[in-house]
Amino acid sequence: MSRVTSGPATAKRHKSVIKKAKGYYGRRKNTFRVAVQAVEKAGQYAYRDRRAKKRNFRALWIQRINAGARQHEMSYSVFMNGLTKAGIEVDRKVLADIAMHEPDAFKALVDQARAALG
């Protein structure tokens, strides 16, 4: 009995890989052997960058909070220390949003942090 190379399972797997490679440039989008490599590498990048995304956003929030705090003559580290001592538990994501969109509310937080530091 001869070996079957074009069975339903193989066709389904090939179709799945080609579908995932849609939008790629050159032979990567329509040649199975090349598409498999491209899709595999894309998965590696996606896995890595899902983790990097968390670090990047935290860094962005810290930069925004620091910029907002420095407008009121206070550094990021001193501001965060003041918030901790004041018992204000607001995460960096929310603080960054307040610093950008509600400067008056952020100034109130800076004043509370300054008061807690003494």
Swiss-Prot record:
PROSITE patterns, per database record: RIBOSOMAL_L20
Signal sequence annotation: none
GO biological process: ribosomal large subunit assembly; translation
InterPro entries in the record: Ribosomal_bL20, RIBOSOMAL_L20_CS, Ribosomal_protein_bL20_C
GO molecular function: rRNA binding; structural constituent of ribosome
Organism domain of life: Bacteria
CDD domains: Ribosomal_L20
UniProtKB keywords: Ribonucleoprotein, Ribosomal protein, RNA-binding, rRNA-binding
GO CC term (a single one): ribosome
Biological role: Binds directly to 23S ribosomal RNA and is necessary for the in vitro assembly process of the 50S ribosomal subunit. It is not involved in the protein synthesizing functions of that subunit.
Record family assignment: Belongs to the bacterial ribosomal protein bL20 family.
Protein name: Large ribosomal subunit protein bL20
Organism: Maricaulis maris (strain MCS10) (Caulobacter maris)
Lineage: Bacteria, Pseudomonadati, Pseudomonadota, Alphaproteobacteria, Maricaulales
